[in-house]
Structure formats: C-alpha cells, structure tokens
Amino acid sequence: FNDVTVGTRGGWIDDERALAQDGDCWIYDENSVVFAGATVSGNARLTLPCVVSHDARIGDSCWLDGAEVSHGARISDNVTIQQSCVRGECHIYDEARVLHHSVVIAAKGLTPDHDQILQIYDKATVSQSRIVHQAQIY
C-alpha cells in the first residue's frame, strides 16, 4: 500500500509474527488488535477498529473493515468483511463478502459429516444475516 511509510503507526499485535514481514499487509487503525496466535499476511489490510484473535488467519488480498474474526477462522483470497463478526473454524474465500452487521458462527460436528466446516466462497454476499454451524454458501 503506497500510503504506508516507515514510521507510520498502525494497530497492535501481541507478537511480531502476527503481522507478516513479507507482502504489504497492514493494520491501519490504532484501535485494531491482532493477538492470541492470529496472523495477518500477504496483502491483507485492516481498516477501522478490527479484532483478530485466537488462531484466525487473514491472508492474500483480504480487506477487513471494522470486523471481528476469531477462533480458527480462515479468510483468504479477495474476501471483504465489513462491520461483521466471524467466529469458529470456517473458511471464507474467493471473492466472498460478509457485510452490514452479519454474524458467522461456525461449529463442526453438528451433522453426520463431523469434519465439514462452514464455508462462504465464490462470489457469495452475506448481508445483515446470521450464518451458523456448517453452512455452505456460494
């Protein structure tokens, strides 16, 4: 990102490994935090206050804007998450969007396929919704 220069203050991390040193990932808002084993990598960017925690993985060219992501969630490719919350072991990828105060709560083991995880992918858009368990949205 061309707007980040040496010495620019960003958000908080609890471990230098939380923010990858390769790529152009950045935590823009000083009120954002990445902690408890969570990582931000690639060209991912976090704007507005964000909380990323508990082994969540944010990578590639994702954009989190005022979002909370935690508990093993994987966000990759070109995903946008705005003003929403994603919790639990799930994968949101491709060009999916989670918008407008949506809540994603993933939980494995609630169907006969105990290994299936919640996924939102392709060009799916979730807006003002609650998505739970092992849903597959595309």
Specify the residue positions occupied by each region the protein language model found.
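Functional cleft and adjacent loop/helix regions within the main domain
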Residues: 1-22
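Structural signal for interior beta-strand "rungs" in well-ordered beta-sheet cores
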Residues: 18-28, 32-138
